[in-house]
Amino acid sequence: MTLIDHLPNDADPDALFEAFSGWAEQQGISLYPAQEEALIEVVSGANLILSTPTGSGKSLVAAGAHFTALANDQVTFYTAPIKALVSEKFFDLCKLFGTENVGMLTGDASVNADAPVICCTAEVLASIALRDGKDADIGQVVMDEFHFYAEPDRGWAWQIPLLELPQAQFILMSATLGDMSRFEEDLTRRTGKPTSVVRSATRPVPLSYEYRTTALTETLTELLETRQSPVYIVHFTQAAAVERAQALMSINMCTRAEKDEIAQLIGNFRFTTKFGRNLSRYVRHGIGVHHAGMLPKYRRLVEKLAQAGLLKVICGTDTLGVGVNVPIRTVLFTALTKYDGTRVRTLRAREFHQIAGRAGRAGFDTAGFVVGQAPEHVVENEKALAKAGDDPKKRRKVVRKKAPEGFVNWGENTFEKLIASDPEPLNSRFRVTHTMLLSVIARPGNAFEAMRKLLEDNHESRKNQLRHIRRAIAIYRSLVDGGIVERLAEPDAEGRIVRLTVDLQQDFALNQPLSTFALAAFDLLDPESPSYALDMVSVVESTLDDPRQILAAQQNKARGEAVAQMKADGVEYEERMERLMDVEYPKPLEELLFHAYGLYRKSHPWVGDHPLSPKSVIRDMYERAMTFTEFTSFYELARTEGIVLRYLASAFKALDHTVPDDLKSEDFEDIIAWLGEMVRQVDSSLLDEWEQLANPEVETAEQAAERADQVRPVTANARAFRVLVRNAMFRRVELAALDKVEELGEMDAESGWDVDAWGDAMDAYWDEYDELGTGPDARGPKLLQIEEDAAHGLWKVRQTFADPNGDHDWGISAEVDLAASDEEGRAVVRVTDVGQL
């Protein structure tokens, strides 16, 4: 029986509480006092602010809230900050209430949208609240991880529903809420329902705290010896986490039997990248690494090993994600300060408690441990003093090591203050956008009154409210000037005194607001141009969010190459530095796109919320004929390869969905096939997750993740594999054109074509010709011949050089090993000859 089968005939609060607590008892769950108190408030119809520690069963209270809403024939919404958590909760609630009663809205996907229980992101709920307001069919809202209300970029989405859905019962939940009296009063005033705050500092697994002045390796060794593992070591940069993992390889973490168990669980898992090969060494030693820059499949493997109790230490960052299920007994802080993008500062109490709260696993541990590590210079000074012993003379002679220049100090007092401090109050992040005005204007009724209430009755200070009002007036005027909004002489049948002149459903996209601009910009391109397909890629890339790490790496590379060239040209230092300021990352079609964007914005003012950003990541990778590994190595992005992959997956989805089928040329289809297959071979989980969100009835999130680790043969997608082969061959042409025989020799040494062989072959070519073409014609299909020899599992390939005379009598001959390609997830090309036909 599912939970929904326990719904009582009578929606009386007592009957509801008895029914739900009875179901919990059948599941072997004993309610904590805070859970009981919270559920009593929920079934009575009150708003609830639930602030209890991590692992104290907030999810059970949320289930009780949905149960109550269903009993009262209400639509209930559950919101979470990330799509992955929304998806996870969707499947959890399907088990409790049945698939027919649960739906999901993420912006990417809409599943069973008319169900009485809806899981969605905060932004989706905010969009509904702006569009429908008090008329929205929403009787209850459960907002998980409510501390995101204070997030600078996204916090507005947690505030809007509170302002615009007075008909709803609200359940706000987080482990780190701080003073919520303002919200308590505000919710009661707006909804007319009493608001209860349920707090509990009592953790199911109590925490103990300790500040250490020993060296980190000594601290860690003691924690391992006293069975306080697994230990999560908190770092404040991804690089520091990886460096720590490498440094800890000298400590013997596991027994031989434990290492065998790790190897067995890893099985045939494929570590395909440079970082992956390092991670393989770490995890086999009992050390995990976990941060946002990793490939999802590597993070999943670390989580899987941790859940099996096989990792003794996990080196990670302070951004241990929401919904990440990593069991931890001890949290060890390497520092109590962090760089926040502007300055180095002491951790905030909320940040500290959010991480410290992960220590101790309910149902597994009887206690959790939080350790604060003293700064390195303090540790060294303590060590020197200990060596001096009790001899006053020796102690006076100790030369104390000073803190590094610019060091923001912390100490035991800092640690104790953070432990004792409550999380800071949540600050409002309200903002006004074109989207907000368009949504409010589109709803029935007087839009001016609705906007005035929204702008003057929110959680902002009066000073900020006036700033938002000025912004709203400016946006409204731009909408009128652009012909998007018109004033009506008389109210229409639904009470509107202003109306939209465009169809929002056609011209406005929640997830890809610039997709309509991309469609318009395609008309500016020349279909006959040899660069047409790549120009379409550049249009779509300009509408995507900037992957800052990639763009910074591209700029650094471009500046390094520019400096080398200027030095070779004898340019003086001062002039070099001046010229260097103009060197940026590649921005194809920049002038054309910005001109088109300016014109488009006049008739579509709302795109002003989303600035255009020309860039070349997909195009750069394709033009250089690089594999994923070659690209991350070339730009030194191995530590952030997860960010690279996320951008590639996002670009693939945008290219596949934004470009109409009638505009997709053969070359463009090749690029999409190549990109999709490359992403899948590196880590298919991002695309699988997207497809699974769109078709959740096919498989669960767990099944999709399991399938993601089962890599399909790269040769299965024939079109994509041909592009991979073509790129592998043309990569050699590009390197040959630059006379980079060392790289070619490194690439082909195993097939007998080392640096000397390549050098001799290219010397012979340069004796005959002074150029080697690498333009669009040089990589065209006319200069590549593929002969498929399926019987022997080989493709025989000939890449002809584009020589300046058009003789086309030089080239590269190679064999492609299909079985080896499937094994390695890439085109395995073995050069057999370089020379004249």
Which residues make up each language-model segment?
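Conserved P-loop/Walker A NTP-binding site and adjacent catalytic elements of P-loop NTPases
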Residues: S21-W23, I29-V205, R212, P230-H235, ...
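Conserved C-terminal RecA-like helicase domain
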Residues: F77-T79, S87, C94-G103, Q238-V313, ...
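Conserved interdomain hinge at the start of the Helicase C-terminal
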Residues: R212-F236, E243, R300-A308
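Non-catalytic terminal extensions of ATP-dependent helicases
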Residues: G288, Q307-A308, K393-K394, V398-R798
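Conserved segment of the helicase C-terminal RecA-like domain
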Residues: T330-F333, T337-Y339, R345-A386
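Compact beta-sheet-dominated globular domain cores
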Residues: A802-L837
